[in-house]
Amino acid sequence: MCKDFFIDTYQVILAKSFGADCILIILSAIDKMLANDLNISTLIEVHSENEAETALYFEKSLIGINNRNLKTLEISLNTSVKLSKILNSHRNPLICESGIYSAENIKFIVKNANIHNFLIGESLLKSHDIGSKLKDFAEINL
């Protein structure tokens, strides 16, 4: 997966040429994308109710709910809870993004948003023992 701030369709072509089979699209940053024409999967990232409603038009895409407000950088897991209610009719998996630091965070999202997929980056990268942290996440009993 290629995660970048896609602002031009050329970047989609470039990602595909480098072997990406999926790109992450921040819905607030784009109007239209070339991904479908290139047969590349898309992960549509949303943070607001309006973006969530728009994302439902991307029927073949995965949808990620970013708990981090990209304007203020504040994180709230309640974003996933709130937006999952709008997105519950989407036929593909939803992904909870940002703000996952512990088993309790994951259990909260599963219980309150019924999301079972997570994009975890920061808490792994900031961990002093990435392997141990990853093992802790993998062993969560839901």
Where are these regions (language model features)?
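Structural preference for beta-strand elements that scaffold enzyme active sites
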Residues: 1, 21-24, 39-43, 61-64, ...
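Extended hydrophobic secondary-structure segments
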Residues: 1-26, 33-42, 50
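Catalytic cores of alpha/beta
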Residues: 7-19, 47-59, 90-120, 132-137
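Glycine/Thr-rich beta-alpha phosphate-binding loop at enzyme active sites
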Residues: 56-85
